[in-house]
Amino acid sequence: TANYDSVPLVCFTGQVATNLIGNDTFQEIDIVGVTRNIAKFVIVVRKREDLNRLIKEAFYIARTGKPGPVLLDLPKDVMAELGSDEYPEEVNIRGYKPNTKPHHGQILRAMNMIYDAKRPLFLIGGGAKIAGAQEEMCKLMETLKVPVVTTIMGRGIVPTNHELYYGNIGMHGNYAANQAVNDCDLLISCLLYTSPRPRDPKTS
């Protein structure tokens, strides 16, 4: 679940020697194919001289942008070879430039929708914890005077005794929070993963 929960995780797996990869060798596994859909990035280390750089890149990719799991596959001959223990100072990966800048047009549109709504409601997920945005989320809801509900992963972002906090939603949530979602005319989802489970066709 590290991918869905945006958990920065670096995994190391063992592999047969590089000259045996792709030959259906005993104990060989197509780890790239197995993990492609559940990992943020998968790297097969082919040369010992690339190992330190790739380890540095793996940790960088795992914790930047949308955090997630990264896997390094280490062939037997690469692990057996001696090499330098120095790591590069900086990481520069061509084609990987996480966008962390806010989109001012989208922010303005969201603010207009909030001001026009009669019963707006914030739904905050665990991404707020990962981003370290607890203080900012509390300040935003207090400034706008908009109530908040959370997902299970988002529990703890808002103090449970806060007057604007209704609790967490869903099957394991409470009645007040679930009813608030049903009654709101604008649901502002922040930093969460939306489930593909079937929903009530009467809702929009």
Question: Which role does the model predict for each range below?
Answer:
Residues T1-L9, T143, D183:
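Alpha-helix C-terminal capping segments
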Residues I61-D116:
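Conformationally flexible catalytic loops at phosphate/diphosphate-handling active centers
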Residues D116-D183:
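Anionic-ligand anchoring segments at beta-strand to alpha-helix junctions in alpha/beta enzyme folds, i.e.
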Residues A17-N37, T160-Y165:
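Active-site-proximal loop->helix
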Residues F26-G65, D183-C184:
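Conserved thiamine diphosphate
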Residues Y193-P198:
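Conserved small/polar residues in nucleotide/adenosyl-binding loops
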Residues V16, L74-A80, G126-A128, R155:
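Glycine-rich beta-alpha junction loops
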